[in-house]
Structures are given as structure tokens and as C-alpha cells.
């Protein structure tokens, strides 16, 4: 079983998408975690349901900020719990393909390796796929096509615009403006 423990993973500020090659299915959950002190109460969609409605002693946060990992420990726990729900395995020895921003520093890249090989998940092989390439593949764009393709990815807290042609990313620009800010602007204009 070649793809039994192979996953395509997109860690976003709003949601985590995990594609299981073995099951040929994509799982999507909110990238949120609810805690009381150091005790985790809820994760994923359940934590999102508590967002902005929880008592003062419960904190609901996202381990990602503006498309980058803000809390290694919390992001690893969210990813581990999702993989456990999908395949009921412990997350050892898997192959993980992470979609990552194009303009990452070495420290930010190391964070992805740590998430896949930290306390809960171990001995995993990690590969990074640049987000514009992953987006193009997901949309069915022929990467080797010599014509230019503009790829626009509007995330929760950031937007990335890229031009891909002939299998190469010609130009890419990421701005810290996403769906949340657009929603907030629309709501404030309506009020």
C-alpha cells in the first residue's frame, strides 16, 4: 500500500486541509484550539463554535497567523488530532507534503519540520510544495503549459498572487490582507 501514510497538508490561518492519498479524500477543519490555562478543551470545528462565545477563562486561538505558524506546539496538536481522526494512526513514519508560502525564511521552514516531527508526530518525511504550485495543481492547471496563468489565493489573513508559466513561478506577491479583513470592512461599511 504505497500511499497508506501519505498526506497533503495545507495549514491555513482559518482552516487545516488534509488530503489522504490512501482514502482519496480531503478533510477540512477549522484551525482553532480552545483551552483553559494549559488544558485543551476543544479543537477544530468544535473550538470554532466556541470562538467569541466562550467564557472569560477559556481562550480560543488559531496556531497560525497571516499564513505562518505562530504556535508550534498548538499547531502540532491540531494536526495530530486531525490525522488520528482520518486514519486512526499515531502519525509515525508518514510522508507529509505541506503547502508553504513562497517567501519563507529558514526559521519558518524549520517550523513545518518541527510540526511534523515534534512531540506527537514522529519520524515523518516532510516535503514542502510552494503554495502557488499547489494551488495550480488543485485547479487543474497544466504546469508545463507555456502560456501564463495567474493564480490568486485569498486566505483568511493573507492573499497571494502568482504568475506561473512553463513549470516556473515567474512572480509572486503576498500581502497581509485576506477574507477576514474584507469581511470586517464590508460589515463596518454596512453599519
Question: Where would I find each of the regions flagged by the language model?
Answer:
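Nucleotide/phosphate-binding catalytic cleft detector across ATP-hydrolyzing
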Residues: 1-154, 164-191
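Short glycine-rich anion-binding loops that position phosphate/pyrophosphate groups of nucleotides
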Residues: 157
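A structural feature that tracks compact, well-ordered secondary-structure segments
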Residues: 160-162
